[in-house]
Design a protein with these regions (language model features):
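Conserved lysine of the Walker
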Residues: 25
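Hydrophobic positions on the alpha1 helix immediately C-terminal to the Walker A/P-loop
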Residues: 28
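Conserved nucleotide-binding/hydrolysis micro-motifs of P-loop NTPases
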Residues: 50-52, 104-105, 139-145, 202
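A glycine- and Lys/Arg-enriched "phosphate-lid" helix/loop adjacent to the NTP-binding pocket
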Residues: 107-180
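ATP-dependent small-molecule kinase phosphotransfer cores
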Residues: 35-129
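Extreme N-terminal, non-catalytic leader segments
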Residues: 1-14
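Walker A (P-loop) phosphate-binding loop of P-loop NTPases
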Residues: 22
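Hydrophobic anchor at the beta1->P-loop junction of P-loop NTPases
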Residues: 17
């Protein structure tokens, strides 16, 4: 199985959040980002599939439903590599707190849930650096679907429709996201990922998040 070669020795702190769609992780990260900035911390945000180099190509292909599971893996690995080199590492060298909405664990969970070989996927990210903290916001696929459907219908790939699990996108969503959740659960102890109950209120989740983040930052010499 994939192992990070070593912890980074850069001045900054890398904090990542993970979870299935609808877990509320992005909301929590935004609140955390705004709070850290408000108390004078140097902080930068980066998210999955946002590299200027390739994200537009990936989004066009997704809209046309053209991506096989392995192609998905490759495109996201290229995107990640570019952001790691151009955004994450420079910010860490400068002493910033880097907040990442999804990290390599997203690929490890989603791609394997799509049937891609686990060792192959992990091998794509052999260059990744180990985060200082990874938080996993845990919620059931059913609750996730309920939250998403309050605003929109499930998207083609997040519902796993490319896998032909069911002709019904709602049923397919639950099946696929359950698979993704199962992969995340396998990784918790393996990668020392901290689980947060995402069924709690937004305020309670943020309180849990800040308490953990404060401890990690204190270990890096940052007292909040």
């Amino acid at each position: 199985m994939f192992r990070f070669e070593k912890k980074h020795d850069l001045k900054g702190t890398l904090i990542c959040v993970e979870g299935i769609d609808g877990s509320g992780k992005s909301t929590q990260l935004k609140i955390l980002h705004d709070w850290l900035k408000s108390i004078g911390q140097d902080v930068i945000f980066t998210e999955w599939n946002s590299s200027q180099l390739i994200s537009k190509t990936t989004k066009v292909a997704k809209k046309k439903n053209l991506l096989s599971p392995r192609t998905f893996s490759l495109l996201h690995a290229v995107d990640f590599a570019d952001r790691l080199e151009q955004v994450i590492i420079p910010a860490l060298k400068a002493g910033f707190i880097v907040l990442a909405d999804r990290y390599v664990y997203t690929a490890f969970a989603r791609d394997v849930a799509r049937g891609v070989d686990a060792n192959w996927v992990r091998g794509l990210y052999g260059f990744a650096i180990q985060p200082d903290l990874t938080l996993y916001y845990s919620v059931s696929a059913e609750e996730s679907l309920k939250r998403i459907c309050a605003n929109r219908e499930p998207k083609f790939y997040e519902a796993g429709m490319d896998l032909k699990l069911s002709n019904n996108p709602y049923k397919s969503y639950v099946i696929f996201q359950n698979r993704v959740n199962a992969e995340y659960q396998k990784m918790l102890s393996e990668y020392n990922i901290v689980e947060i109950d995402a069924t709690k209120s937004i305020h309670a989740k943020q309180a849990d998040t800040r308490a953990i983040v404060k401890k990690v930052l204190a270990g890096k010499g940052v007292q909040l």
